[in-house]
């Protein structure tokens, strides 16, 4: 049985977040949390929070054993993009795209 947790509208691009997500896919939860703790990326902090939430959901709602959990599925989808204006020289302007993403983590017990 899979238990999931989601973080929606995270202020990080999906491309940057997927770099970290790909590292922990399929790992045992304890090893994944250890890897995320010592990563220097902003996405690692966000994903670690979602992973901890998924583990808490599994333990509280379904009574699963935390030590036997594995990151079965993790994916990052693009959220809406906020468009901002940046003034440039000679009356011009550039558009800045502030990207967001939706992070979904699913954990399951080892088979």
Curated annotation (Swiss-Prot):
Keywords per UniProt: Ribonucleoprotein, Ribosomal protein, RNA-binding, rRNA-binding
Cellular component terms (Gene Ontology):
cytosolic large ribosomal subunit
InterPro entries for the chain: Ribosomal_uL22, Ribosomal_uL22_bac/chlpt-type, Ribosomal_uL22_bac/org-type, Ribosomal_uL22_CS, Ribosomal_uL22_sf
Q: Which CDD domains does UniProt cross-reference here?
A: Ribosomal_L22
Task: Please give the superkingdom of this protein's source.
Answer: Bacteria
MF terms in GO:
rRNA binding; structural constituent of ribosome
Q: Name one GO biological process term.
A: translation
Q: Which Gene3D superfamilies match?
A: Ribosomal protein L22/L17
Pfam families per record: Ribosomal_L22 (PF00237)
Q: What is said about its interaction partners and assembly?
A: Part of the 50S ribosomal subunit.
The record's HAMAP family line, in alphabetical order, gives: Ribosomal_uL22_B
Tell me, in a sentence or two, what this protein's role is: This protein binds specifically to 23S rRNA; its binding is stimulated by other ribosomal proteins, e.g. L4, L17, and L20. It is important during the early stages of 50S assembly. It makes multiple contacts with different domains of the 23S rRNA in the assembled 50S subunit and ribosome.
Q: Which family does it belong to?
A: Belongs to the universal ribosomal protein uL22 family.
Can you say what this protein is called? Large ribosomal subunit protein uL22
- Recorded source organism is Francisella tularensis subsp. holarctica (strain LVS)
